[in-house]
């Protein structure tokens, strides 16, 4: 009986002393195909290869939620401003004169960040004017 325990102890000692048996030696290897992988929806002659998953940029859920919140708050603030302007009786011409002068070139006006606000207010004004017209007549 003692011989079995001695033999077992010797085998365990050999296993521990041998690094190849218990220690896991893993070498990471990159696999590179010898050809370009194409999407099944593209023709084989199309030079646009399919993008790898690692190269696609994705927002985290927190960043997406924060971005959505910032956009919705900006729109809510803009809609409140438009509502106040509309109730004060300001027309799109009044808003145009607030942001731009009559002597400005149309290219300069179109490149201004205020042009977007002016054009969105024009849409808001026309939509609400159409809805309010039958109430006031």
Curated annotation (Swiss-Prot):
Span(s) of short sequence motif RxLR-dEER = 48-66
Glycosylation is annotated at: 79, 131
Keywords of the record: Glycoprotein, Secreted, Signal, Virulence
Task: Report TM segments.
Answer: none
Q: Does the keyword Glycoprotein apply?
A: yes
Q: Outline the inducing conditions.
A: Expression is induced during host plant infection.
Where found, per UniProt? Answer: Secreted; Host cell
First and last residue of the signal peptide: 1-23
- Give the GO cellular component terms, alphabetically: extracellular region; host cell
Primary localisation category? secreted
Q: Which cysteine pairs are joined by S-S bonds?
A: none
Q: What is known of its domains?
A: The RxLR-dEER motif acts to carry the protein into the host cell cytoplasm through binding to cell surface phosphatidylinositol-3-phosphate.
| Family indicated by similarity | Belongs to the RxLR effector family.
What the protein does comes down to:
Effector that is involved in host plant infection. Contributes to virulence during the early infection stage, by inhibiting plant defense responses induced by both PAMP-triggered immunity (PTI) and effector-triggered immunity (ETI).
Q: What is this protein called?
A: RxLR effector protein CRE17
Q: Which lineage ranks, top first, belong to the organism behind this chain?
A: Eukaryota, Sar, Stramenopiles, Oomycota, Peronosporales
What would be the name of the gene that encodes this protein? CRE17
